[in-house]
C-alpha cells in the first residue's frame, strides 16, 4: 500500500512538472511574438539575410536614413581620415606625406594651438553650464501649471532657433564698443565706468562675450528632450514616494526625476559636447576673423581657413580628424560616466 502511494505521488509530481514546463514554453512563445528562435545550424550571414527578408518593410522604412547617413556623414569622415595623410590643394594630384600634417599641426602650427586652447576654454564653460541649465529649466517648466508649459518652453527654446550669425548681429548692438552700445550706455549712465569698455576689441573680454551669447541660445534640442522626459515620468511614482516619506521637490528630483530621465541625460550630453566644440560662426560674427590677437580663434574657424581660403584640403582634413577624435572621446567618456551614475 505504501509503495502504491509513493508511485501515485511520483506520477502526480511528473504531471505537474510537465504542465509547468508546457505553460512556460507557451509564455516564452508569446513573449517572442510567436517567432522562431535562431537556427544555429545556419551560418550567421544566412540567418541575418533571412531576418532582413522577414522584416523587409521595417528595413525599407529606415533605409532612407541610413543612405543619407552613409552618403553625407560616414563616407566624408572616411575620406577626411584618408586625405589627412596627403598633401592636397584641390588642384594637383594628392601626394602621400604620411604623418607630416599631424606633426606640423601639433609642433609648428601656433595658430592651431591657440585655437585649441580657445575652443577648450569655451567648451569647458559652455558645455557643463548649458547642460545643467537645460535640465534645470526643463525641471522648472515641469513645476508650473500644465497650461503655461508650452509658453515657457517656447520662451526658453526660441533663442536656439537663431543661427550663430543672426545672434551675433543682435548682440553686436548690445556689446558695441562705443557709448551707443546698450551695455556701455547703462554702465556709463550708472557711473560705474568712465569710458566705454572695448568688449569686442579687448582680448580679455572677447571670449567671455562669446560665451555669454552662446549660453543665451544654448537651450536647444537637449532642452526639449529634458522637457519630454519630465512629461513622461510616471506620476504614480510621486504618490508612492510620498508614502515612503519623500515629500520635497528636491528629494523627488534626486530619487525619481533624475533616474527616470537618464536616457535624456545621455542624449543631451552627446549633443552638448558636440555643439560646444564646433563653435565658429558666432565668434566670426562678433569679433571677426582674424580677431584681435586671435583671441576668438576656434578650431572650426582654423579648419575653415585652410579648407575654404587656402584650399589645403589635406591639412584641413587633419584638423577635422583631430576635432572628431576630441568630440568622440569626450562624448564617450561623458556617456560612460552617466551610465555608471545611472
Predicted feature residues:
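Transmembrane alpha-helical segments of polytopic membrane transport and secretion proteins
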Residues: 1-61, 146-149, 333-342
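A structural signal for multi-pass alpha-helical bundles of membrane permease subunits
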Residues: 51-342
